[in-house]
Amino acid sequence: MTKKQKKMLIRICIAIVLLLIAKFVPMPGVVRIVLFAVTYLVIGYDILKKAAKGIGNGRVFDENFLMAIATLGAIALAVYEKDTDLTEAVAVLLFYQIGELFQSYAVGKSRRNITALMDIRPDYANIETDGKLEQVDPDTVAVGSVIVVQPGEKVPIDGVVVEGTASLNTSALTGESLPREIIPGEEVISGCIDMSGVLKIRTTKNFGESTVSKILELVEESSSRKSRSEAFISKFARVYTPAVCCSALALAVLPPVINLIAGNPAAWANWIYRALTFLVISCPCALVVSIPLSFFAGIGGASKAGVLIKGSNYMETLSQTKIVVFDKTGTLTKGVFEVSGIHHNELENEKLIELAAHAECASSHPISKSLQQAYGKPIDRSRVSDIEEISGHGLTATVDGMKIAIGNDKLMEKLGVDCIPCHCVGTILHIAIDGKYAGHIVISDIEKPDARAAIAALKRTGVQKTVMLTGDTKRVAGQVAKDLGVDEVHSELLPADKVTQVEKLLAEKSPKAKLAFVGDGINDAPVLSRADIGIAMGAMGSDAAIEAADVVLMDDDPMKISKAIGISRKCIRIVYENIVFALVVKAACLILGACGIADMWLAIFADVGVMILAVLNAIRALAVKNV
């Protein structure tokens, strides 16, 4: 609880004690009125101050003005009727302040989730000078400098580890508690916490361009992007509040005047009381407070789960998503080539991989890297000679005195070697040794473990169609789509073709259905911007993704996509629940108040009670664990 909240709680407690004394302890009438007045000022002085300030600034009609007029009017009416019991007037402000405390707590809880994310901001960077560590401002560290990160410290700037090993806690960024093991040569991003081991990191970016700075900028700007619901409520309150003030004035004046004209008693006190009750009931704070709070809580809850939503307008659009389009590589697949199959003739698997890795040792192609990774041992280049690349076919080399040919079926055909066809999906590398077929190795982009479950989860959330876009061949793309359960696939696409394909899908869909595009942030910026909602996945370290996307998933777990949609739908559902509940209760109580059936206590419930219930409902948007 903040200092301000504690002060308010103390004021509420003092006001309750004073109110009970004034209500139930016998005392002279004048003393009772004075005690009620003191209680009123203890609990409501800030409301009176805000109302006066609003009038001075030309913003007359707000909830503070309504509360001030209604309660001061109730006090004046009681004094006029020589009634020393001012409980109703004081209770209106007391319960209003209790409602405000609830709201403040809810906002604080949401803000703490976002603040936990904001806590990734590093205060300093360590630079080693003459064998001693010197703490400097991260802004002053140049690209290419070597910084030192000790256990318990935050990584201040993106870079590459040049010395040391450690476990990094990335939970503030990804929402995942599992530590990430780091070794020399690996990239690290700012905002992670070093849990063990000293790291020396060569920076690859300035602090202002680092991941942590980009994310903090994104979070700070999220509250400025309003949804249609928030914009409507703001406009509604600007028209609604003056309208109810005029209605209350009419209710206080017109019926007594009509009574006088008709020759009946005016009953001014009765109609003024009804008008004051009408004012309290009509206060729009339940809507004005709970709607932005629901979105704020939703964004806070999402950030805790490693999902950054750039504003409530994007949350509203995300909740209406019916079509999800994936750029295959990096979202549904790992985007890393791996050896997925070895089919040999006479040689053992290990020997075939060893010869293939050595033959490909001079190539920088990803296929060569995947072979070396599968081999898992250092390459002895002294064993390799006479390397010759054959464009579009493969290469030949001599390894340990043996003539190795490795490539596609066209290479085997060119060399007159009969190869065995392979029906596996992926890149097939046929291998011949001294002119004799030795077998083949299958290299493919591996599907993510949760990719199939992620597609199924999207369909359970109500997504009507999933689409996969890829530059792969039709055969490979079709097999991946079939394995994962994707509804529609478009293959052999260039980056520009993906934009065209998304535009076609946008033209075909219904206006109410929204299309989300999911990419890994690499060359995806045009498509992320073109879709109704752009989702960048695994965006840690990708500036382009953070800039172009509307929703940023901080790790590469495809299950987070359905979670993001689920969070947004829960948030929007809560918003509509609060709107309907507040309007229905207020409308019913306004009618009862105008008819003289509702008293000030019912008015308190219609205002403060509804606001507290709406705020408590809004807090539910923070709970995202089981969404």
How should each PLM-predicted stretch be described?
Residues 29-37, 60-68, 81-92, 232, ...:
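Membrane-water interface of transmembrane alpha-helices in multipass transporters/channels
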Residues 122, 126-130, 146-150, 323-417, ...:
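Cytosolic catalytic regions of ATP/NTP-dependent phosphoryl-transfer enzymes
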Residues 2-124, 235, 242, 342:
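Transmembrane helix-loop-helix hairpins at the membrane interface
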Residues 65-66, 91-151, 172, 182, ...:
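Juxtamembrane coupling segments of multi-pass membrane pumps/enzymes
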Residues 116-209, 313-356, 398-399:
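Conserved cytosolic catalytic loops of P-type ATPases
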Residues 56-57, 63-71, 173, 273, ...:
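Conserved catalytic phosphorylation-site environment of P-type ATPases
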